[in-house]
A protein has these predicted regions:
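Glycine-rich phosphate-binding loop plus the immediately following alpha-helix
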Residues: 63-93, 97-98, 102-163
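Adenine-nucleotide phosphate-binding core of ATP-dependent small-molecule kinases
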Residues: 159-190
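Generic structural "secondary-structure junction" signal
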Residues: 25, 31, 36, 118-121, ...
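Short, well-ordered amphipathic alpha-helical segments that serve as non-catalytic structural scaffolds
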Residues: 1-9
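Short beta-strand-loop/turn "lid" adjacent to the catalytic site in phosphate-handling enzymes
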Residues: 8-73, 113
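Residue-level marker of positions within ordered structural domains that often coincide
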Residues: 6, 24, 88, 136, ...
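Short, intrinsically disordered, charge-balanced linker/junction segments flanking boundaries
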Residues: 3, 37-41, 46-51, 178-190
Length: 191
């Protein structure tokens, strides 16, 4: 830690430093226990893991029960509370709101009254990367992601809403290429 932040801390004496994200995970610098939903900013503040009291703390992640199993997030709570602050404008205050945080593990967060009520994690980016790089579909796709083909993306979303199931719809990326009905960037966008 000192190798990374020692100079910064020395240059800013007395300024508190909050660390968020995987730094508080089991694989991080120190494990900060999860705070349970529902949770507001004050709940998070009460559960800070102080490494140097009053100076340096790790922000806890959050946990909730989602469909009968535990779900967790670390770091995204800082984005959510920032968004909740922005939503305090007239006509937007309170809630409820659903905030979507796209990424490797996308989060759909339910908020109400300035609190995070619960959330669901989806392995969107990670699944895309695995399919894109290590499945039979990889050979059909361009080596690098290019610009989004919005029409192909919309077609993929529309197909996902039809009967047949996710795995069948994923295989259709291959068959569309085999029958020259789509190729390249369109396939990647559809996927």
């Amino acid at each position: 830690f000192d190798a990374e932040f020692g100079v910064w801390l020395a240059a800013h004496p007395g300024l508190p430093c909050l660390l968020a994200g995987m730094v508080g995970s089991r694989q991080g610098w120190a494990e900060a226990p999860y705070a349970a939903c529902p949770a507001g900013l004050a709940d998070i503040a009460r559960q800070l893991l102080w490494l140097q009291p009053g100076r340096l703390a790790i922000v806890p992640g959050l946990s909730c029960e989602s469909d009968g199993v535990p779900d967790v997030l670390r770091g995204e709570e800082t984005q959510v509370f920032g968004a909740l602050q922005a939503l305090q404008s007239p006509g937007m205050a309170g809630g409820p709101h659903t905030l979507v945080l796209p990424g490797t593990h996308s989060k759909w967060v339910q908020t109400d009254g300035g609190q995070m009520r619960g959330f669901r994690t989806h392995m969107t980016g990670e699944t895309y990367a695995l399919l894109r790089q290590q499945s039979i579909l990889a050979r059909m796709l361009p080596a690098e992601d290019g610009d989004l083909d919005a029409d192909a993306f919309d077609a993929g979303v529309a197909q996902a809403q039809r009967p047949g199931g996710l795995l069948h719809h994923l295989f259709s990326v291959r068959t569309l290429a085999l029958f020259d009905r789509a190729g390249g960037a369109a396939l990647a966008s559809r996927l």
